[in-house]
């Protein structure tokens, strides 16, 4: 069976996923597209040679008889309505982050999915599909370094545009760590604090950069995450887990070591898409396979809710300077195990 997918949103991310579905992945094809800009939808159909219907409204894509699953890559504030509509139609839906722009919106999706009685939602958190993170989780779960005590992490971008704001360091940048570190440790966060080091001269006037986010988990693990989005030298993701008996570190992407002119060096990536390109392929293939097999296993609506609650607390901590509690609703039995 070839899974017939409808895509809502044909911007950069939407077209990147259409490219994957058309040229890279197996078991699926795009049969319907929509974008708020009709020309962008037409361009996607032409560019990738799609045999797909172009719809004027995303909800028409969800309702289309030949659409068996939905891919939501539209503007963030529209995600919640499209995901809820897909659930109401009983159709599996892959939604790029954010699942919803508020924790309350995420909870409405959780409640709708629980009421439906079957998992239909996968959220576009790709880092759990990265080989390096998977290897790191294997070491943690095997007990090789003992119980984790501390994590030292960094999320560094070469530079960001003028529209990037201080809160986006949480909602656009840290959000990936909030998801993957919770997945690595298998436990929720209980508090967050944000502190501000000396500001880099490369940051715009309205942006606080760098920032350090301090998190605590339910078992007492302490996490520090450096967010530095104008580091200049490249795109660099670091994660070191300090355990009772040893330390495990996220491996850097493979790169050729160069010795030349009395220097030794390794090239550092500058593009976040390049760093995790394989993970994007794996996550979407996992969604396709999960739908075809009747069992989604990727990041769930509950994971989207958990990330949103933690992000809200971090934004409050940015503003207050205090240690802010992270209070989540009780996890439904539907999402356990």
UniProtKB/Swiss-Prot annotation:
Signal peptide: none annotated. Transmembrane segments: none annotated. One of its GO terms (biological process) is inositol catabolic process. GO terms for molecular function: inositol 2-dehydrogenase (NAD+) activity; nucleotide binding. It catalyses: myo-inositol + NAD(+) = scyllo-inosose + NADH + H(+). Keywords: NAD, Oxidoreductase. The keyword Transmembrane does not apply. Pfam families: GFO_IDH_MocA, GFO_IDH_MocA_C. Its EC number is 1.1.1.18. The keyword Transmembrane does not apply. Homotetramer. Involved in the oxidation of myo-inositol (MI) to 2-keto-myo-inositol (2KMI or 2-inosose). PANTHER family: INOSITOL 2-DEHYDROGENASE, PTHR43593. Belongs to the Gfo/Idh/MocA family. This is Inositol 2-dehydrogenase. It comes from Burkholderia ambifaria (strain MC40-6).
